[in-house]
Amino acid sequence: MCKSLVIVESPVKAKTISKYLGKQYIVKSSVGHVRDLINNKSKNKKNIKKSNIKHNEKTALIQQMGINPYKNWKAEYHILPGKEKIISELKNIANKVHYIYLATDLDREGEAIAWHLKEVIGGNSLKFRRVVFNEITKKSIEKAFQNIGKINMNRVYSQQARRFMDRIVGYMISPLLWKKISRGLSAGRVQSAAVRLITDREYEIKNFIEREHWKISLSLLSKENKKVTMDITHYRNKTFLLNNKKEVNSTIEKIKNLSFIITDRKDKIFKKKPPAPLITSTLQQASNIDLGFSVKKTMFLAQKLYEQGYITYIRTDSYFLSNYAIEKVRSYIENFYGSDFLPKKSNIYSNQKYSQEAHEAIRPSDVQVVNIDNCDPDAKKLYKLIWNYFIASQMKSERYKSIKTTVMADVFKLQSNTKIVLFSGWTKILKKSNNVNFKFPVLDIGTTLILDKILPHQIFTKPPPRFSESSLVRELEKKGIGRPSTYATIITKIKEKGYLKIKKNKFYAAKIGEILITRLKKNFSDLVDYDFTARMEKNLDQVSDKLINWKHLLNSFFDNFSQQLEQAKKPPEEGGMELNTTVPTEIDCSLCNKKMGIKTAVTGVFLSCLGYNSEPNEKRCKNTINLISLNDLSTTKKEEKNFHLKNRCKKCNLVMDVYLINENLKIFICINNPSCNGYNLKKGIFKKSLNCSLKKIKCEKCKNDMLFKTGRFGNFFMCINDTCKNTRKILPNGEISEPKFEPIPFPDILCEKSNTWFVLREGISGIFFAANTFPKSRETRSPFVEELARFEYLLPKKLHYLASAPQRDNKGNKTIVCFNKLNKQQYIASKKEGKFTGWAAFFIDRKWCIVNK
């Protein structure tokens, strides 16, 4: 018993840390969380005693949630599926060592993982040590092991309080939403406020009424034939504003014979400070804007960079930089850019209103490493972005000259503003300056200019823009909703739930999301109240700081939520939650001649036969008609705007959503549906911008027709055969995806993290191995070529070429199957010690071509 056990969350992190620790340390990974709250699915039914006593509703709910709010928040945990082997191994090693170092991440989640590991491993509590570090470097690791501590239980309590609240809301409100609105719905303490941001913006956009106005620019010439362009800004000392073409023509008549004299010119020198080093939220925004990465992808790549020791810890909202980091970056700037770019003192940035962590900002672990090798190309781009912001944050400000020139023509004032960059400063690294070195002619005050051209411009006011991932993150941060470390999870959840649709990287609220938020505003106002959500985050932070008792906070939240829940369960006429009713229409059902009604579900808006609910189960008519939303068609902004302008509900005067029923019929539905039953039908011949929307294709499995559908993950075709239900996705370019093969069992290839075996699946990023017990075990990996070659007889014909690929590179490293997203092509690459070697092979002209980087 001379060695010590060190436990971290990820295998990559374990591998990196083991390089800096001596042989007396055994470094192992827990592969993330090992325990979670128990639920019905995770209970071992063999251990549940049979009873004739029917559980009452409260008891059943407690069993489902795994927590008991009526008994001082007693919680029941279970080992996560697939983690049994890992826990068994950790326990075995723990019994043979003197000390156990819990080196999980330094945030609340990491603290909770450390506590769960301690509880699961058990044994003498004096053996456990807590070590934390902000970066995975030799110096940082050595310092951490010289300053060992204990698990911070206040941080654990804060994480548990957040987890318990989320579990309460999710488990207690979902049955109500399923009953009152639609199956598959859920609400969340933070996610519902995020959905409200998108639905409120959707409402603003749809009800926006544009206003026309005009501005006039003038092209002027000096006697030396020097040309300048200026805007009319004032008329009789009032802001110049024209509302229509008539006013424009009148103004042109007034100014075309006037004299234009320069009356003022002001030159000022300004400085533009560099942006702060990146924190979690600004990393997500910058990555989305500059690199086009989703928030989820950004956090995934950043986590890998941290675990490999390239950057500091990624979950932080502090702009603080250590003295060591500042000293190194200032030295780098002076050596590589010169002393002109180095400020006399380091740049200091103040933290934000809701800042809670005392960590450093995100920065490179070693500023001398400008580019990294043996990494995913996207990870390299993200590292370079982080490096650029870090360097720029400690450089001198950009200096530029602002030139403001004023010209008078009788009662008209004209102005122009020009910026000339004098010193690039930090923009040498981050080229974010929009300043243009346009030199305004040096003309003296009193100079007379000659009118050359009159340039009128028609302008329309614009509605607020739709949220992108970056702007949604910025708004969440601004309102204090959630924490930056949770933004990726929030956005992923609301995407998966079908509360929004994404078109050209912009968020469109789905109808079911609008209905959900309308109902929550009335019956669960706290869940969608921005200020309440922000205050709760602040309270959870105070739990970490031991300023608030976590159970008192939970009791207060639970009491209030329970009262709202009981009220919402009542009938609508007694103040309960409104139902998601079907709105009758005059459209006849093609199967039973009853009328069709407008129905909204998670899958979208559609027409459903009213005979479905009016008849006994065996006689129900299940006929439905899919409605194709205007937003799902490739219409122009002008077309979309015109639809909303021209069609308003005759019952409530709100705008109407437009759907295509078929090539000869459109339906306009009030945006307040189903609360308002207003709708209009329009007959005609309608051209489709989305060419495949009404296209008929045959199912490759059963040869029946496939119909266009709209779902929470986008548009697709679905087989009309109920026993088949085959689907084909519609790609962003409008094309229909190629048919995918059925999962192929590989019982001889076993999983590493669970007692099961792999199946070969085909996804949007090519083929991959996945555990056959998915979703119980979510283990996945890329297939080795030698595995495909060994079991070639199991593969469909279209994959046989992969089995013929080189099984090893020129240095003997095994090759795996990869996917090029740009070219939508499978290729072969090799790895050594978990990193790509740069060797690759592509299948071109029916043969494998090897590429060495």
From Swiss-Prot:
Ranges annotated as C4-type zinc finger: 589-621, 649-676, 699-724
Record's catalysed reaction(s): ATP-independent breakage of single-stranded DNA, followed by passage and rejoining
Positions of the catalytic residues: 313 (o-(5'-phospho-dna)-tyrosine intermediate)
CDD domains for this protein: TOP1Ac (cd00186)
UniProt keyword annotation of Magnesium present: yes
Molecular-function annotations in GO: DNA binding; DNA topoisomerase type I (single strand cut, ATP-independent) activity; zinc ion binding
Alphabetized UniProt keyword annotations: DNA-binding, Isomerase, Magnesium, Metal-binding, Repeat, Topoisomerase, Zinc, Zinc-finger
Domain (Toprim): residue spans on this chain: 3-136
Binding residues annotated for Mg(2+), in chain numbering: 9, 105
Region ranges (Interaction with DNA): 186-191
Organism superkingdom: Bacteria
UniProt-listed Enzyme Commission number(s): 5.6.2.1
Family matches, as Pfam families: Topoisom_bac, Toprim, Zn_ribbon_bTOP1, Zn_ribbon_Top1, Zn_Ribbon_Topo
GO cellular component, one term: chromosome
Summary of subunit composition and partner proteins: Monomer.
The family this protein is said to belong to: Belongs to the type IA topoisomerase family.
Role summary: Releases the supercoiling and torsional tension of DNA, which is introduced during the DNA replication and transcription, by transiently cleaving and rejoining one strand of the DNA duplex. Introduces a single-strand break via transesterification at a target site in duplex DNA. The scissile phosphodiester is attacked by the catalytic tyrosine of the enzyme, resulting in the formation of a DNA-(5'-phosphotyrosyl)-enzyme intermediate and the expulsion of a 3'-OH DNA strand. The free DNA strand then undergoes passage around the unbroken strand, thus removing DNA supercoils.
Annotated protein name in UniProt: DNA topoisomerase 1
Organism: Buchnera aphidicola subsp. Schizaphis graminum (strain Sg)
Gene that this sequence comes from: topA
